[in-house]
């Protein structure tokens, strides 16, 4: 039922003319991410790298009671459109979310949470920094682990914090659930 709900909602919620097209493979990617949130039903969540809010919407469909803190510097060429789209999704779907518009690399700490989604800076240093920002969060979902720099950051983070990562390939990208 959750998978179908996401398959129905995402295409309608997609930003018009987004360079990142919504297709069946992309929908499966968001379904895989939402399944992690559905399994744990967090009260609070942190999302580093929220962009247009597609993951946030998928997480909301999986766990509508979760309160989210989203962090994004919105520094790309399409960032203003993405930010406005994010605001519309949050309002339209009544998502409990607050945003910090800041480059996560400028942060030294974030509040406690039950779940974190790390999908911000995809450089090794940026991904590792973001993971350390949420090091005390019990379950971390790291996206884009098919990117060698991100995967290495996840592996090094897990080695230094004595945590485990379960890597999965959703057909579009590789995800890591860190516990």
Where are these regions (language model features)?
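Class I SAM-dependent methyltransferase Rossmann-like catalytic core
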Residues: 2-40
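S-adenosylmethionine/decaboxylated-SAM
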Residues: 19, 31-179
């Amino acid at each position: 039922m959750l998978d179908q709900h996401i398959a129905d909602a995402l295409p309608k919620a997609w930003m018009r003319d987004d360079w990142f097209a919504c297709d069946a493979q992309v929908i499966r990617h968001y379904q895989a991410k939402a399944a992690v949130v559905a399994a744990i039903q967090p009260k609070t969540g942190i999302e580093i790298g929220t962009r247009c809010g597609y993951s946030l919407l998928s997480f909301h469909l999986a766990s509508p009671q979760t309160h989210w803190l989203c962090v994004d510097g919105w520094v790309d060429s399409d960032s203003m459109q993405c930010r406005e789209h994010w605001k519309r999704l949050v309002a339209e779907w009544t998502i409990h979310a607050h945003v910090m518009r800041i480059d996560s690399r400028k942060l030294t700490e974030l509040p406690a949470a039950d779940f974190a989604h790390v999908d911000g800076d995809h450089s090794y240093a940026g991904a590792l920094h973001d993971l350390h920002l949420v090091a005390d969060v019990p379950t971390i979902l790291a996206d884009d682990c098919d990117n060698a720099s991100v995967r290495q950051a996840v592996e090094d983070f897990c080695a230094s914090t004595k945590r485990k990562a379960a890597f999965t390939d959703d057909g579009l990208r590789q995800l890591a659930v860190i516990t």
